Structure formats: C-alpha cells, structure tokens
Amino acid sequence: MSVDQATVRRVAHLARISVREDELGHLQNELNAILEFVEQLADLDVSGVEPLTSVVPVELPMREDVVTDGHCPEKVLANAPDAEGGFFTVPKVVE
C-alpha cells in the first residue's frame, strides 16, 4: 500500500492538523515507511505464539467495582477550559 499526497492532505484534514505544502512530501515518506513496517508485521507467522497481555507476568490485585463521582468534581472541573452542568465542554470536531 502506498500513500499519495492527496491521502496525506485527507488524513491531516480528518485529524484537524494544519500541514504546509512543503511538508507533504516528508509526511508522505513517513506514512509510507510506517505502512511498510506494518505490512512486514502482517507477514510474520505467529500461529504458535501464545497471546499475552503483558511482557512481564504480573497478577493485578482485584477490587470490588464501586461507582463514585470521585468525591472531588469541583477540583476536576477547575482544570477544564470550559464546563457546563458538571461536565467538560469541548468543541464539536465530528462532522
């Protein structure tokens, strides 16, 4: 798979990233290198490899799940640039 400059522009637009025209070639090369690496990973035979969730065998302590509000919503929302009704307010980015 190969990425062209039109695809770089589209990905940048979807990610809401401003990209100058003189950066397109470099980003195209970077994305193509990443995709080439991913394609190499897809070619590996991992049929005999056991799935794992951690590279170090660790057992995590279990605890009962309890729903709380964190007991400090004011402190949490104090860091928000904008809040309404106890929630973070963010700009709409999905069209």
Curated annotation (Swiss-Prot):
Family annotation (SUPFAM superfamilies): Glu-tRNAGln amidotransferase C subunit
GO molecular function annotation: asparaginyl-tRNA synthase (glutamine-hydrolyzing) activity; ATP binding; glutaminyl-tRNA synthase (glutamine-hydrolyzing) activity
Domain of life the protein comes from: Bacteria
InterPro entries: Asp/Glu-ADT_sf_sub_c (IPR036113), GatC (IPR003837)
Aminoacyl-tRNA synthetase found in the keyword field: no
Keyword Ligase among UniProt keywords: yes
One Pfam family hit: GatC
Enzyme class: ligase
Reactions performed catalytically: L-glutamyl-tRNA(Gln) + L-glutamine + ATP + H2O = L-glutaminyl-tRNA(Gln) + L-glutamate + ADP + phosphate + H(+); L-aspartyl-tRNA(Asn) + L-glutamine + ATP + H2O = L-asparaginyl-tRNA(Asn) + L-glutamate + ADP + phosphate + 2 H(+)
Keywords for this protein: ATP-binding, Ligase, Nucleotide-binding, Protein biosynthesis
GO annotation, biological process: glutaminyl-tRNAGln biosynthesis via transamidation; regulation of translational fidelity; translation
EC number assigned by the record: 6.3.5.-
General function of this protein: Allows the formation of correctly charged Asn-tRNA(Asn) or Gln-tRNA(Gln) through the transamidation of misacylated Asp-tRNA(Asn) or Glu-tRNA(Gln) in organisms which lack either or both of asparaginyl-tRNA or glutaminyl-tRNA synthetases. The reaction takes place in the presence of glutamine and ATP through an activated phospho-Asp-tRNA(Asn) or phospho-Glu-tRNA(Gln).
Quaternary data: Heterotrimer of A, B and C subunits.
Family per similarity comment: Belongs to the GatC family.
Protein name per the record: Aspartyl/glutamyl-tRNA(Asn/Gln) amidotransferase subunit C
